[in-house]
Each structure stands twice: as C-alpha cells, then as structure tokens.
Design a protein with these regions (language model features):
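Mid-chain, well-packed structural core segment of small domains
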Residues: 66-94
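Core segments of cupin and vicinal oxygen chelate
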Residues: 2, 9-56
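Short strand-connecting beta-turns/loops that link adjacent beta-strands
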Residues: 15, 35, 67-69, 103-104
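Short beta-strand micro-motifs in enzyme catalytic cores
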Residues: 37-41, 72, 105-109
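N-terminal beta-strand motif that seeds the catalytic metal site of vicinal oxygen chelate
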Residues: 1-21, 71-76, 123-128
C-alpha cells in the first residue's frame, strides 16, 4: 500500500484573520491549541479519536508563518519517518525540519522534494 496524504497545513501571518477567513468562506471549524501554538482545522466530521469519518477526507492545521513553512503544505502519513527521510534523501530530496515529537500524538518532519516543494511527514504514536 502506498503512503497517503493525511493532513494539510496553512501558514498565516495573522492567525485571527486567517481563522475568520476560512471559517466564514468555507464553514470550517478551527480550534486553537495554545500549548502547541497551533490550530486544528476541521473540514470534515471526525469520530471520537479525531479521525475523519468521510472516506478520503482530511483535516489540517494552521500555524504562524515561519521559514521554511511559507506556503500551504500537504502531509504524508508514514509508518517510519526516519526511513521515509532516508528514501527522500536517496532520491534527491532534502530534510528541512528533522523528526520531532508532537506531544503524545506522534512525530513530524518536513522535507523539500527535488522540485523545491516543501512536504510534511507524519507518523502516529498509535499503530495503524
């Protein structure tokens, strides 16, 4: 099975303005996580474990714009971030932000592909 796009992120210079825009323009629910300086963006209904209930639908996040995350980013779910970053680099990509923990939820990292696009990786702390 191939790895899937599981998340998106939208950077913003003014988080209040960006939250209001996406809530009003698209009806998205946006919840702040101040302890992580991050916002959860719900574009589709979720279950009790915060997983989208509609097949193929994804939710995302919003955070303050800071390099290298200057434009929207898709995030690919993988089982092993270290192995994924190794493959990326073997194929001409570059690690931009190394693996880091996100509370007790999982791990994230960012890489640029050979075309210069920034892409995120996510590995859940919970298997499956």
């Amino acid at each position: 099975m191939t790895d899937k796009v599981v998340h998106f992120e939208i950077p913003a210079d003014d988080l209040d303005r960006a939250r209001a825009f996406y809530q009003q323009a698209f009806g998205w629910t946006i919840n702040s996580l101040p302890e992580l300086d991050y916002n959860i963006v719900e574009t589709t209904p979720i279950d009790e474990t915060n997983v989208p209930t509609e097949p193929g639908a994804i939710n995302g996040g919003m955070m303050r714009r800071q390099a290298p995350i200057n434009s929207p980013v898709i995030t690919i779910g993988v089982d092993d971030i270290d192995a994924a970053l190794q493959r990326v680099e073997e194929l001409g990509g570059k690690t931009e932000i190394p693996k880091q923990g996100v509370a007790d939820m999982g791990f994230t990292a960012y890489f640029s592909d050979p075309e210069g696009n920034l892409v995120g990786l996510w590995a859940s702390a919970q298997p499956g």
